[in-house]
Amino acid sequence: MMTSRSEYRLILRQDNADQRLMPLGHELGLLSEERYQHMLEKYRLVAQEKKRVLKTNLAPAPELNAFLEQHGTSGITTGCKVADLIRRPQLGYAVIAPFDPTRPALEPVIGEQVEIQIKYDGYIPKQLEQIERMRKLENRKMPEDLDYTTIHGLRLEAAEKLNAHRPQNLGQ
């Protein structure tokens, strides 16, 4: 699926396809126990590292501020969380590694996933709410005999398509 054509592209990203689909594949017997356990371990490490960067403070330092300005972003005057720096568009998980002394040695894919989750943290809950609202709309049935051409404000082309497809609920 091309995520650019999906309504929920923040949730249906290619980087998290294993997290979304492997549990189903395992349940259906299409995935070995070894691969499934490997995926679970990967996301356990991601969650653990995300928790760490959300808690870890960095103190202001001349070297850090020079580095930040060199990367086109403002320096810090008070301490900040590692996650706050990762959220900046000019920076990322790997870029700030020299200033994160408690960082464990992890596979690059773990760091990439941590960065993506940190950067999308504000947007994903909103999209999950949107998905839940759409699910509720799917429970609202449409009258079978509704003539969409009688609805004022609806373009003729849209009304004709709706009359042709006859959606059964508001979610469709």
PLM regions: where:
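Extended, charge-enriched "interface" segments that sit outside catalytic cores
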Residues: 5, 11, 22-171
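Active-site helical microenvironments for divalent-metal-assisted chemistry
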Residues: 12-18
